[in-house]
């Protein structure tokens, strides 16, 4: 019974066929090995875990059912650890680790190239060989280290999204932003419980079998990594909230600019419409006095052009014609003069008062 996409290696770096016979032979010789089961069906996993290894029924049940919170449970002589990692493709992978003092069994539904790469390094590794505690550490450390490149890539995406929003906000950017927020929420749901789990593990309240003081230092480093990852997740969530506010503010500002421009157009045409209506009245005085071309050009066209130019000058001075609504900078002669001595004092940092 061979299992595809899985591997079995012993602590000496040799790889073996994943089969029931091989596992039984290694168990009979008390050899230390690591068995990784990737994407196996429930019947195959049940046969290996229950019949071949003889694990506790509750341990088998928890190991076969995914979607659990990160946790550590002890069942007789086996300890179950549920750990989440992040792959290079930006998705979470749930790994169930069945740990004993002689062997380690890892189970996961989705492919995890990081664990395969770790197995390759172990096969090529020279002495010293990791013991059972450090083997579990290497597996968990590989999964946790996968978060950092994913978060670094997310940081770059947030920067690019923020720059794009400042240039031209679109509805598509909102979809990208909310996808990132959902991804961070999913990260938080698994990172924080893992952080608490390793805090308990390194405090001595729920130590692993065979844990030594030297190995505990390595597991404490995992706890430090999870604290850092949790802080990064919180920082990126706050940053995305700021990007969302930036998007909404930018859209609102652009809308205000459009409304302002339309208001300017309506304001310009308001006096023109008044003049047109006023001189369009059919009274005898206007009909008798505005009869020549110069009178028409002066009263009908010239007055409207003068009003339009006057309004544009007023709008220009108030800064209403600029896209950002800012007032044009003052001329150099109109700016207040600051001497070099005054500039030097302005540039100096404030000194703290002397303490009593």
Regions inferred by a protein language model and the residue ranges of each:
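Hydrophobic alpha-helical transmembrane segments and their immediately adjacent juxtamembrane loops
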Residues: 224-356
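Short acidic-hydrophobic sequence patches enriched in Asp/Glu that either
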Residues: 114, 214, 218, 294
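Peripheral, non-transmembrane regulatory/ligand-interaction domains of membrane transport proteins
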Residues: 1-204, 210, 221, 225-235, ...
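Long amphipathic alpha-helical coiled-coil segments
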Residues: 201-216, 237-251
């Amino acid at each position: 019974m061979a299992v595809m996409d899985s591997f079995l290696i012993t602590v000496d770096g040799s790889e073996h066929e994943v089969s029931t016979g091989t596992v039984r032979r290694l168990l009979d010789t008390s050899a230390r090995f690591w068995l990784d089961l990737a994407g196996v069906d429930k019947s195959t996993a049940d046969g290996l875990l229950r019949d071949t290894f003889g694990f506790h029924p509750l341990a088998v049940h928890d190991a076969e059912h995914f979607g659990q919170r990160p946790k550590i449970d002890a069942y007789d002589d086996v300890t179950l650890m549920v750990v989440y990692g992040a792959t290079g493709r930006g998705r979470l992978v749930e790994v169930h680790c069945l740990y004993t003092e002689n062997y380690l069994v890892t189970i996961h539904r989705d492919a995890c190239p990081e664990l395969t790469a770790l197995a390759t390094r172990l096969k090529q590794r020279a002495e010293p060989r990791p013991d059972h505690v450090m083997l579990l550490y290497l597996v968990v450390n590989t999964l946790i280290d996968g978060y950092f490149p994913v978060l670094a890539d997310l940081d770059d995406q947030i920067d690019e999204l923020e720059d794009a929003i400042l240039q031209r906000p679109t509805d598509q950017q909102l979809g990208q932003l909310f996808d990132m927020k959902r991804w961070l929420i999913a990260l938080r749901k698994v990172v924080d419980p893992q952080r608490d789990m390793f805090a308990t593990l390194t405090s001595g309240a729920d130590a692993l079998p065979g844990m030594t003081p030297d190995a505990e230092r390595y597991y404490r480093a995992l706890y430090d990594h999870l604290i850092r990852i949790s802080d990064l997740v919180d920082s990126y969530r706050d940053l995305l909230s700021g990007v969302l506010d930036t998007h909404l503010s930018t859209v609102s500002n652009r809308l205000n600019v459009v409304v302002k421009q339309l208001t300017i157009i309506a304001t310009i045409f308001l006096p023109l419409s008044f003049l047109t209506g006023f001189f369009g009245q059919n009274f005898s005085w206007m009909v008798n006095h505005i009869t020549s071309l110069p009178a028409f050009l002066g009263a009908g066209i010239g007055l409207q052009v003068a009003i339009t130019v006057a309004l544009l000058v007023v709008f220009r001075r108030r800064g209403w014609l600029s896209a950002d609504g800012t007032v044009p900078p003052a001329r150099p002669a109109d700016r207040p003069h600051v001497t070099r001595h005054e500039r030097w004092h302005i540039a100096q940092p404030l000194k703290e008062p002397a303490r009593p």
